[in-house]
């Protein structure tokens, strides 16, 4: 890999690792998210950094992503990366709780509905827990809308990049 590519990879890998260290140290037995701000921070470190990484790599390696396009992509690169993460958090609540001992639904959202992270899988708490998810659904929807805008800013000539972004 050329020196610029190595520097890009190093920069964003370090950002991700240092950020994730905070969550692992704070909750060594399983991640617990306190509030919506911390939810955003978690999503940034685990996925927003990937949005930056890809954007920087594409700018460096693709002749169709000039400075003007790059500037526009930077506006939405974090939600581009975070969209899949926010959707996966919503989709995998039970799996994360049972297998990873991780609760990404913020404590304050659950408390506002009369529930708690300890009751995330309790059938009796299901209505309260579902109500607590509404703000996270809005976050995911916003991330998806902004990620689509990100893809729209990619040049039509960047076919492989556009396909990478659109196809799982």
Model regions and ranges:
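Catalytic cores of Mg2+-dependent Asp-rich isoprenoid enzymes
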Residues: 1-83, 90, 94-168
């Amino acid at each position: 890999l050329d020196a610029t590519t190595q520097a890009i990879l190093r920069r964003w890998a370090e950002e991700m690792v240092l950020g994730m260290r905070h969550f692992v140290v704070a909750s060594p037995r399983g991640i617990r998210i306190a509030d919506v701000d911390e939810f955003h921070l978690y999503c940034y470190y685990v996925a927003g950094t990937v949005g930056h990484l890809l954007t920087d790599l594409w700018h460096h390696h693709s002749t169709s992503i000039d400075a003007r396009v790059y500037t526009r992509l930077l506006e939405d690169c974090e939600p581009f990366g975070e969209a899949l993460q926010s959707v996966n958090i919503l989709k995998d609540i039970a799996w994360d709780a049972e297998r990873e001992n991780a609760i990404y639904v913020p404590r304050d959202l659950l408390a506002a509905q009369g529930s708690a992270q300890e009751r995330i899988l309790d059938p009796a708490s299901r209505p309260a827990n579902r109500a607590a998810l509404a703000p996270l659904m809005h976050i995911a929807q916003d991330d998806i809308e902004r990620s689509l805008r990100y893809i729209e800013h990619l040049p039509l000539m960047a076919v492989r990049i556009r396909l990478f972004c659109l196809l799982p």
